[in-house]
Amino acid sequence: MSTPLRPMSTGEILDRTFNLYRNNFVLFAGIAIVPPALMLVVQLIQAGMVATPGHPRATTAGFAAAGGIGMMLGVFAYLVGLAVAHAATVFAVSAVHLERTTTIGESYGRVKGRYGRVVWVIVQAALRSFLPAILVIIVAAILMPLAAKGGGKAGAALAGVVIGLAIIVAAIMGLVLYLRYALAVPACVLEDIKASAAIKRSVFLSAGSRGQIFVIYFLMGIISFIVTWLFMIPAAMLAAATAKGSPALAALFTGLAGFLAGTLAGPIATIALSLVYFDQRVRKEAFDLQLMMAAVDGTPLPGAQAASAG
């Protein structure tokens, strides 16, 4: 390996992220294209169900119910596709970072049979992180009317402030907890372990680097926002100029913009987090030495160390 694995700073991880993305653009964009394509299909189907002149059936209750069910199924398919693409991207990063070759098909093929496991990892991480915040919001929704009814305007105002602060604190706690599980998918994919074990591995590996992970999420969020609006603004202008009276055509323009933005920006955060995973294994488990001891190229990456069990 011409570039041995070594500990990297946040700046070096970001630099390596963009180098890998730029040098393997077709690979990463090709993997990332699946979820935006699924969402585009969902948006176009939904647009086709919007009431238009000459199509009164679009306003019937049965048609609306069918559209709602179709929309939910489409969103579910999109989320599953997003999880699978995330896993395939992780494998692709492991290959190119360790100077091996791979393709779009091979990256998806290597995670075949682990789709359900990856989805369950993501669901577990989300529930562990944000379920408390959701419960706080539900309690707030129940208490607000009671406070307004029993305490007058002053009591309602005070209750609103307290409940609002509780929701904010719960949301912040959820985000902090989510940082603990940011490396669960790389652990699941590259070490071929169960969802619960991947969650535990992420807690161990992310310890001491959660500030770094937060910075990466924050910067990648900004990049995604900018890329999205670079496509959305022209699409909205084009729709306003040419798609008057045609919701389907307007949805096509905005859907294509979202498709392009998702394909281009989607893989970047996953690349960065995969590199954080490698960095933490180098720091905590001397992963560079383990790798040099591997017998042949293509050998599965060495798994969890006993030290990570806690």
What residues fall within each predicted segment?
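Juxtamembrane transition segments at transmembrane-helix termini in multipass membrane proteins
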Residues: P4, P53-G54, A58, G81, ...
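Interfacial aromatic "cap" segments that immediately flank transmembrane helices
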Residues: G11-L38, T102-A133, I163, V176-L230
